[in-house]
Design a protein with these regions (language model features):
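Primarily auto-inhibitory N-terminal propeptides
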Residues: 2, 13, 19-139
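Protease zymogen maturation seam
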Residues: 34-38, 112-172, 180, 184-185, ...
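Solvent-exposed loop/turn segments at secondary-structure junctions
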Residues: 87-88, 99-100, 123-127, 178-182, ...
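Hydrolase catalytic cores
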Residues: 215-218, 238-244, 267, 331, ...
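C-terminal subdomain of the subtilisin-like protease fold in secreted/lumenal serine endopeptidases
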Residues: 253, 264-271, 280-281, 285, ...
């Protein structure tokens, strides 16, 4: 049985509660029709740790109300947040209150509601922490965009070879943040989204810049002559504004944003945010997303400590640390059990309102992992790879950068987008090799830009004997010198854990 409230209220308190509930309730539009289509969630799994059932009744429903409001003073502004199970989906409402007395009474009332699975008291807090940084780094361009030279992270992650395998087409990544500005480099890939704070259907407003920067890392268009490129340049971004211009907000708004993103069909949810509070509404929303087959990626925090940061610390969420250009874990990056993976997060060039800027933080590392998840989902659908375990592909293919093996600073290692795609089977799909002979030079060309080990063989009698072994250049081309005349040669791309064997047709030296 649900707890029933009894006893008289202090004079005027009943009216105050009624007013709080009347004007302070907000909830996600859970019944809204999908605006982005079906991203084939059934084709992708995210195993790892099994998240708790979001609909399991939390201890907060039966806890004494005064324990939930103990941190409030007489004049503190707060929210009483309730998570309800409505037809198998979470509905999260929030009542604005002032002071401990009013908050306690509202908590008791919400605990008695049929279908309540969690009740929380929240205060507004800062949930983002990006660090602007100037940079003059240069290097080989991965696109024709003007800021491509400054995008060292794309080269480290092997974006070019990755794009020959997948580009994010057909996938949507929700960015739950300070909103996303309508910048030219994002316009083609930016959906309308939702503004949770204002309660309107448009998340394309960012008075902070954090969310716009994150979105650009994921899906800025490539080769359009503007700015730089995102790691998944053809993925769509679903902007959800849950934090204000100062990067502050309530966990209930973030939770509502997560539920909205799931209901709108986003396959990947990026949370470049974090706090030290394990909030039941946030936990329920994250578990709802994971149970719905979504990939949830979150920053582990920038304090340089081992403190747990939520939502990164929740089971099933991919927690991301930050590395620098030298593949070292950044000094500011948090460590601990929440860290599953690391990604570039120092001097990251991306879009901001009105232009471009270089930021550092685990907030900047997180969208690289989200973008790679979108690439994996895109490849799974386009190439018919079947069920892909995103977390397993990311971790199995990571580059070891800290202590050998899995460690508390970098998790499984530094992200490699190309390696992750290969681990999922995308590299072997459709790989072909063509060989040609001219003046005793045998040239082999693969049908994609990739470095592969290739073997030159010569026919001796009825058998093929190995002559030479080398790797193709990044362009997928390798050249062998042959000496014997009137002999048949062929090139073999040997089978590996990533590729199936490919054999060219025999050629003769004339």
């Amino acid at each position: 049985m649900r707890k029933v409230i009894s006893g008289a209220m202090p004079p005027g308190l009943a009216a105050a509660i009624a007013m709080a509930l009347a004007v302070g309730l907000v909830a996600t539009p859970a019944s809204a029709a999908s605006a982005v289509g079906d991203p084939a969630h059934a084709a992708v799994t995210h195993d790892g740790e099994t998240p708790a059932d979001w609909a399991e009744v939390d201890d907060s429903v039966a806890a004494p109300a005064r324990t939930l409001t103990a941190d409030l003073d007489a004049n503190d502004k707060a929210r009483v947040v309730t998570v309800k199970d409505v037809d198998g989906a979470p509905v999260i409402t929030a009542a604005n209150v002032k002071g401990r007395t009013q908050a306690t009474a509202v908590v008791e009332q919400q605990q008695a509601i049929d279908g309540a699975v969690a009740v929380a008291v929240q205060q507004k807090q800062r949930l983002v922490a990006g660090h602007p940084m100037r940079t003059s780094q240069t290097g080989r361009n991965v696109s024709s965009d003007p800021y491509s030279e400054s995008q060292w992270a794309l080269r480290t992650l092997e974006a070019g070879p990755s794009w020959s395998l997948a580009d994010g087409s057909g996938q949507t990544v929700a960015v739950i943040d300070t909103g996303v500005s309508r910048e030219p480099d994002l316009a083609k890939n930016l959906l309308v989204g939702w503004d949770v704070i204002r309660g309107r259907s448009d998340g394309r407003d960012d008075q902070n810049g954090h969310g716009t920067h994150v979105a650009g890392v994921i899906a800025a268009a490539s080769n359009n002559g503007i700015g730089g490129a995102g790691l998944a340049p053809r993925a769509k971004v679903l902007p959800v504004r849950a934090l204000d211009a100062a990067g502050k907000g309530y966990w209930s708004d973030v939770a509502n944003g997560i539920v909205y993103a799931v209901n709108q069909g986003a396959g990947v949810i990026n949370l470049s945010i974090g706090g030290d509070t394990d909030d039941p509404s946030l936990r329920a929303a994250v578990n709802y997303a994971l149970a719905s087959g979504r990939v949830v990626v979150a920053a582990v925090g920038n304090e340089g400590t081992g403190a747990l940061t939520y939502p990164a610390a929740y089971p099933g969420v991919i927690g991301v640390a930050a590395t620098d250009r030298s593949d070292r874990v950044a000094d500011f990056s948090n460590s601990g059990s929440a860290v599953d993976l690391a990604a570039p997060g120092v001097a990251i060039m991306s879009t901001v309102p009105g232009g471009f800027a270089s930021y550092s933080g685990t907030s900047m590392a997180t969208p690289f992992v989200s973008a790679t998840a979108a690439l994996l989902r895109s490849a799974a659908v386009a190439r018919g790879l079947g069920r892909v375990d995103v977390l397993r592909a990311l971790q199995a293919s990571a580059v070891d950068v800290d202590s050998p093996g899995v460690d508390s600073r970098s998790g499984a290692g530094r992200l490699s987008a190309r390696n992750a795609l290969c681990a999922a089977g995308a590299c072997s799909y459709g790989l072909q090799a063509a060989a040609s002979m001219k003046k005793r030079k045998l040239t082999v060309r693969l049908n994609r830009e990739t470095v592969q080990r290739v073997i030159l063989q010569r026919k001796v009698g009825k058998k093929w004997k190995q002559v030479s072994v080398r790797s193709t250049m990044a362009s997928g081309v390798a050249v062998f010198k042959v000496k014997k005349r009137a002999k048949a040669y062929r090139v073999v791309v040997p089978a590996t854990s990533e590729t199936s064997a490919v054999v060219t047709r025999p050629l003769k030296v004339r």
